[in-house]
A protein has these predicted regions:
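Alpha/beta-hydrolase active-site loop
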Residues: 144-165
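Gly/Ala-rich beta-loop-alpha elbow adjacent to hydrolase catalytic centers
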Residues: 168-177
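Short alpha-helix in the alpha/beta-hydrolase fold that links the catalytic acid
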Residues: 118, 262-271
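Short beta-strand/loop motif that positions the catalytic acidic residue
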Residues: 245-246, 252-254, 258
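Catalytic histidine-centered segment of alpha/beta-hydrolase-like enzymes
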Residues: 284-294
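Hydrolase active-site cap/lid region
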Residues: 183-231
């Protein structure tokens, strides 16, 4: 394939998501109000759906230093009788097998390699590092998931490969982690980067993206409560779960220009988490913050 054909193919691939999103918006906006139950079931399914994207070259380079890349089987009632092979990325610290272990956890539609820029500096600071692809993300099987399954993976890995000295969590991983810590997982320090803190915020963002009418939003909330209990929102919102975590110091980092998760989400988490501090950045957005040298330095210094 010549360069022109390759460029045309890439251009078409880049436009596909935009075309699909426009189609979804048209359907939800024009048909959703007429058939809220039918279209609501579709929206409810999309809520749990994940999608995978190609790994950038910079992440491939970060992974080259990993000591071990392998699938680790975990078992939890969340996945029924079958073991789930979770892809893990592990960095040893020389011959020091007793070095404190830091767990990195990515966000929704993310991947373990996204967090790998932290590995080198953490190794230099005397830590070992574990990252992983959560359920239904990148190299770990599954097409749909939710916070309870993703928390089950985090807790199972911590039990199997731990103890975990500290956690560095990005985005949705920063909501999963407080939930995990109130359901048996143990650690000594936590860094949350660009985390959402309210279930309501996630639903509002989802609804805004797909142009969901209120009738569809109401259907989804009722379905959530029917499937997971009337107190679902309180159970998973980290402004609630973090209130129980005053014994664990936390650093919360968020960029003022983050358009995916508003900085107000971190500000409210900071207020709720008794033993937390917060740092603000500018101009980094939601993802570039993960490989900003100052953010990495602040994270490592906090974990020392």
């Amino acid at each position: 394939m010549d360069n022109n054909q390759d460029s045309q193919k890439k251009s078409k691939n880049l436009h596909k998501p935009a075309i699909v999103l426009s189609l979804f918006r048209f359907i939800f906006r024009n048909i959703g109000a007429l058939f809220p139950s039918l279209v609501g079931r579709w929206a409810y399914h999309l809520w749990f759906k994940t999608h995978r994207s190609l790994r950038p070259r910079r992440e491939e380079k970060w992974l080259q230093s990993a000591t071990q890349i392998k699938a680790v089987e975990i078992r939890d009632e969340a996945f029924g009788d079958k073991a789930l092979p979770v892809m893990t990325y592990y960095w040893e610290n020389g011959s020091n097998l007793e070095a404190p272990l830091i767990m990195l956890i990515h966000g929704w539609t993310g991947r373990g390699s996204q967090m790998a820029a932290f590995a080198g500096p953490l190794l230099k600071a005397g830590f070992r590092v574990l990252s992983f692809d959560n359920h239904a993300h990148d190299q770990t099987p599954g097409n749909t998931t939710h916070i309870f399954k993703q928390s089950a993976v985090q807790r199972a890995l911590a039990e199997k490969l731990g103890p975990i000295y500290g956690v560095v969590a990005h985005s949705f991983g920063g909501m999963i982690t407080p939930y995990s810590l109130t359901h048996g997982m143990k650690t000594q320090k936590v860094v949350c980067i660009s985390p959402p803190s309210h279930f309501d915020f996630l639903l509002a963002r989802f609804s805004q993206t797909l142009h969901l009418p209120k009738s569809i939003q109401d259907y989804m909330v009722n379905r959530f409560k029917k499937e997971y209990g009337d107190n679902l929102i309180e159970r998973v919102s980290s402004t609630n779960t973090s209130k129980e975590l005053g014994h664990i110091p936390a650093l919360i980092i968020h960029d003022e220009d983050d358009l995916d998760v508003l900085i107000s989400e971190s500000e409210q988490l900071h207020k709720a988490w008794p033993n937390s501090s917060m740092k603000r950045t500018t101009g980094l957005g939601h993802r570039r913050i993960l490989y900003n040298p100052q953010v990495i330095e602040d994270t490592v210094d906090f974990l020392k």
